């Protein structure tokens, strides 16, 4: 994806995220600064629906970024010395072309709320898209209590 296309998409996305919170659009230049603001805004966005138009732009951006960064397959993961049916991966979990990943999430299942924090929760929630936090919130509301340690939920992967 061309740098100009990424910047245009990010500008649209950041503008909408700022507007929904009554924030002024940040005085930023270039992809890197826009990306930092985008990450901070989505990392701290409450789980809520957003327009299909915004989701389309977000999905276009995220799928393009993931493709640019390179996707790793199961064959790139090491076979466990204890069980040949288990593969071990060390690296960016958002770059795996697999059917599922496991996140040691917090008991609210809503990810990290620290803007721009480089943790696995933020990586997964950023690259999956804002749909993931909304789905997790809906699952937790239906469940009516926090997720116990050692339990799991299956969600959509969205852009992952």
Residue map of PLM features:
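Macrodomain-like recognition of ADP-ribose-binding/processing modules
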Residues: 1-160
């Amino acid at each position: 994806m061309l740098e100009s296309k990424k910047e245009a998409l990010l500008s649209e996305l950041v503008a909408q995220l700022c507007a929904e919170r009554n924030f002024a659009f940040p005085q930023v230049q270039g992809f890197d600064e826009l990306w930092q603001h985008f990450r901070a805004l989505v990392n701290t966005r409450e789980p809520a629906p957003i327009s299909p138009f915004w989701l389309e732009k977000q999905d276009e951006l995220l799928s393009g970024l993931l493709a640019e960064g390179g996707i790793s397959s199961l064959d790139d993961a090491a076979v466990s010395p204890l069980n040949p049916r288990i593969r071990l991966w060390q690296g960016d979990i958002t770059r795996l072309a697999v059917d599922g990943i496991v996140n040691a999430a917090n008991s609210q299942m809503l990810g990290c709320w620290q803007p721009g924090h480089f943790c696995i929760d933020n990586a997964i929630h950023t690259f999956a898209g804002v749909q993931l936090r909304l789905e997790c919130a809906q699952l937790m509301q239906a469940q009516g209590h926090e997720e116990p340690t050692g339990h799991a939920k299956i969600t959509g992967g969205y852009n992952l």
